[in-house]
Curated annotation (Swiss-Prot):
GO terms for molecular function: structural constituent of ribosome. GO terms for biological process: translation. One of its GO terms (cellular component) is cytosolic large ribosomal subunit. This is Large ribosomal subunit protein bL17. Pfam families: Ribosomal_L17. It comes from Moorella thermoacetica (strain ATCC 39073 / JCM 9320). PROSITE patterns: RIBOSOMAL_L17. The keyword Ribosomal protein applies. Signal peptide: none annotated. Keywords: Ribonucleoprotein, Ribosomal protein. Belongs to the bacterial ribosomal protein bL17 family.
Length: 112
């Protein structure tokens, strides 16, 4: 499976992505770099698909990946049912410009 390394070791990269997915589902939108957002998009869509399924096994898979139990509850009670009739495309990436310090391309990723 292809993925982006994001300039980090495997454990650091996985934990960073878990943190970002948890934040996105908690707040509905976040601003991050373009490469992180592209990697985040597929993970967030997988989590929302688990929320749509709504069974016990899906809930346990989400609990194993997400870092906050309140976010898992929100995923299964609010976010999953909101996208019950939609097949994919739950997130949107909007370019917002470049970061002041290093010129990295920044984007806003949000739930549609």
């Amino acid at each position: 499976m292809a993925y982006r390394k994001l300039g980090r070791l495997a454990g650091h990269r996985k934990m960073m992505l878990r943190n970002i997915v948890t934040s996105l589902l908690k707040h509905g939108k976040i601003e991050t770099t373009e490469l992180r957002a592209k990697e985040l998009k597929s993970l967030a869509e997988k989590m929302i698909t688990l929320g749509k399924r709504g069974d016990l096994h899906s809930r346990r898979q989400a609990l194993a990946y997400l870092l906050d139990e309140d976010v898992v509850t929100k995923l299964f009670k609010e976010i999953g049912p909101r996208y019950a009739d939609k097949n994919g495309g739950y997130t949107r990436i909007v370019k917002t410009g470049f970061r002041q310090g290093d010129g990295a391309p920044m984007v806003l990723i949000e739930l549609v």
